[in-house]
């Protein structure tokens, strides 16, 4: 296939790919916009969920403050005795329900620094109010469209005055014991001191990400102050861990998306993060969204490209099939064109070029080569005694002799050269960028090829060689080589 035809084929094939890809790109852009909006919705829903948790924590704190502010009845001797009988010490910590649920009056575990059970009697009598508040908030009706999910977050209460901590869920002291009771000092419970100090403003605080001493995992906490008579008494805390965050960010309406969604919370101050979810394959991201929450928490979401392929497989399959069909049509068209072109300029009997190859375009190309200093050699070839072969052996044998000579010529030249059957037993060879020496050796090389492919045949030929000059036409060059052929043939006949 000629260079310009090959370039045209590549151009059309590239155009087909571009045009069919534009449909896929349009789908990708539309999906990008839709999924970007959906990621914003996920973050807004998570932000609302944090507000809902904040409201619940404030509700629990308010319930505790009402219980503390109410007039307290004196603890009965029986209740005091039950509390002190259940009071235990383990792992350098003291309190109730440390290793087993020995005091049924409390649902969870109370840990204190004091070795005297009398110091926690009043607390043990008041903490059921905390249990009731947590239980009530967990089971209240959800009017927030999924914001108040039925899950068990970790609630606990720190009393700053009496130095005890009460966990709503039982905590085995063998696995975690509160040993540093200086709550307001940095590092005592893992929460940054700046976050604890913000509690003194009276607001509920969402802490930065820190490593929880109990679970050794990165968590966040909501801290709500508890006041009595205008003085800060304690803090109600709600831990938000990775599992809680997975429930908050989980795409319930698009479960397939969760397989390809990356969700990370990062603390912009400390650099700590919580990797909530990771794509199963994570090929590369095609949609991403970043949003900063109050308190220096950055939410980063991204969707892997495999989600688009999986969710839009019909569009992708349609694009692939359309592109393949159109590319195959282009290939078949150019193959047909190549076959037709080859048949148009090829000699049916020998497979060499025919006269139609001698076009003005070829003439201009050869003239440019000559003008640039390259040598173009014309060799005219004519079979000897073809009429005698036809008369004695038949035209079929004569055609065979022509075919064998054409085969020998074709095997003796380069692909860049032109071997042309002008008609009958007349041939013309055009050697491009050759030399007179090479041209002079070509007839001998053709004779050797004839002897090799047809050793039993006596096929002879005569030739004439001419070097094309500037301003020579194809007709001029061939005529000059043909005249030399005639001279050489006359000389050969006179010798025989």
Swiss-Prot record:
Its main location: membrane. The record marks 387 as: Transition state stabilizer. SMART domains: GGDEF. GO terms for cellular component: plasma membrane. It comes from the Bacteria. Residues 374-496 form the GGDEF domain. Homodimer. This is Probable diguanylate cyclase DgcJ. It comes from Escherichia coli (strain K12). The lineage of its organism: Bacteria, Pseudomonadati, Pseudomonadota, Gammaproteobacteria, Enterobacterales. The gene is dgcJ.
């Amino acid at each position: 296939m000629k260079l310009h035809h090959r370039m045209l084929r590549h151009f059309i094939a590239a155009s087909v790919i571009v045009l069919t890809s534009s449909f896929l790109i349009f789908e990708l852009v539309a999906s990008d916009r839709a999924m970007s909006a959906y990621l914003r919705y996920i973050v807004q829903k998570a932000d609302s969920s944090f507000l809902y948790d904040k409201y619940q924590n404030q509700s629990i704190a308010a319930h505790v403050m009402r219980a503390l502010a109410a007039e307290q009845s004196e603890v009965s001797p029986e209740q005091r005795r039950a509390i002190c009988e259940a009071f235990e010490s383990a792992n350098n910590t003291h309190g109730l329900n440390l290793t087993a649920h020995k005091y049924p009056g409390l649902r969870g575990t109370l840990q204190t620094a004091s070795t005297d059970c009398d110091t926690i009697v009043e607390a043990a009598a008041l903490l059921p109010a905390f249990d009731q508040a947590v239980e009530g908030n967990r089971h209240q009706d959800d009017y927030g469209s999924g914001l108040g999910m039925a899950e068990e977050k970790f609630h606990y209460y720190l009393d700053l005055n009496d130095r005890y901590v009460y966990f709503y869920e039982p905590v085995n002291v063998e696995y975690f014991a509160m040993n540093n009771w200086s709550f307001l000092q940095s590092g005592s419970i893992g929460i940054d001191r700046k976050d604890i100090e913000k509690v003194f403003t009276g607001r509920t605080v969402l802490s930065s990400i820190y490593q929880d001493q109990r679970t050794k995992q990165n968590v966040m906490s909501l801290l709500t102050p508890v006041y009595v008579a205008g003085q800060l008494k304690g803090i109600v805390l709600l831990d938000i861990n990775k599992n809680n965050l997975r429930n908050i960010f989980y795409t319930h309406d698009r479960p397939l998306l969760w397989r390809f969604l990356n969700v990370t919370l990062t603390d912009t101050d400390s650099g700590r993060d919580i990797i909530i979810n990771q794509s199963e394959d994570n090929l590369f991201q095609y949609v991403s969204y970043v949003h900063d929450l109050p308190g220096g928490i950055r939410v980063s979401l991204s969707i892997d490209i495999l989600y688009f392929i999986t969710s839009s497989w019909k569009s992708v399959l349609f694009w692939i099939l359309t592109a393949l069909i159109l590319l195959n049509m282009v290939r078949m068209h150019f193959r047909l064109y190549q076959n037709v072109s080859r048949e148009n300029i090829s000699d049916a009997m020998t497979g060499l070029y025919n006269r139609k190859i001698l076009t003005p375009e070829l003439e201009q190309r050869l003239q440019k080569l000559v003008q640039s200093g390259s040598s173009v050699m014309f060799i005219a070839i004519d079979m000897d005694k073809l009429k005698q072969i036809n008369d004695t052996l038949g035209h079929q044998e004569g055609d065979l002799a022509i075919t064998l000579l054409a085969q020998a010529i074709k095997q003796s030249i380069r692909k860049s050269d032109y071997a042309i059957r002008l008609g009958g037993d007349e041939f013309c060879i055009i050697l491009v960028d050759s030399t007179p020496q090479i041209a002079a050796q070509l007839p001998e090389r053709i004779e050797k090829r004839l002897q090799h492919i047809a050793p039993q045949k006596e096929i002879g030929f005569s030739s004439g060689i001419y070097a094309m000059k500037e301003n020579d036409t194809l007709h001029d060059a061939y005529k000059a080589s043909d005249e030399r052929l005639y001279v050489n043939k006359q000389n050969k006949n006179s010798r025989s």
